Amino acid sequence: MVVVSTRYEFSQHFDFPAAEAFSWCTDYDPKDHNLMGNKGYRKVTRVSDDTVILEDTLYPQGKAVTKKKLIKIDGERMTYFNFHLTGSNKNSLYFYRVIPEGDRKSRLEYTGYELTYPKRAPTKRQLAATAEADAATRTKKWGRLAKAMERELRGKRS
């Protein structure tokens, strides 16, 4: 079995204080995939104040793909971990940290430690291209989420 480990990272700016952005990011909902532009649904099970199990079903290329994820939330540090228990990225870990940028703005720092299981080992060039494409996809999705955050949180302030 071939196992490929890839690390990638990006950041996403938010026009909201860090605590408010962190709270929004960790408030999981069955409709989250719609916010990211995905066709799919999510089952959210709150195990404890700092632990959530997500069961996501998505439809890339029209075929159902289900992933189960363990989320660990550290509100004091404004960090959370997303560990994939099942699916094509089984045993992958994603780390999120919301950092204050003054009193009214913040940014999300994201690092993905992703495992994939291809039939054949990719070349270094293929690995680099995959990491770049994955980061671009996640950046695009987080851009959509930032816009959704803007709509929801600005609406609450009005």
Task: Give the location of each predicted region.
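Glycine-rich portal/gate segments that line the openings of hydrophobic small-molecule binding cavities
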Residues: 29-33, 40-86, 144-156
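Short amphipathic alpha-helical segments
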Residues: 17-20, 24, 133-141
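Beta-strand/loop substructures that line and gate deep hydrophobic ligand-binding cavities in soluble
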Residues: 84-140, 155
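Hydrophobic/aromatic beta-strand elements that line small-molecule binding cavities or substrate pockets
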Residues: 10-12, 42, 65-72, 82-84, ...
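Hydrophobic ligand-binding cavity/cleft-lining segments
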Residues: 1-51
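A short, structured loop/turn motif at beta-sheet edges
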Residues: 15-19, 46-49, 72-77, 97-107
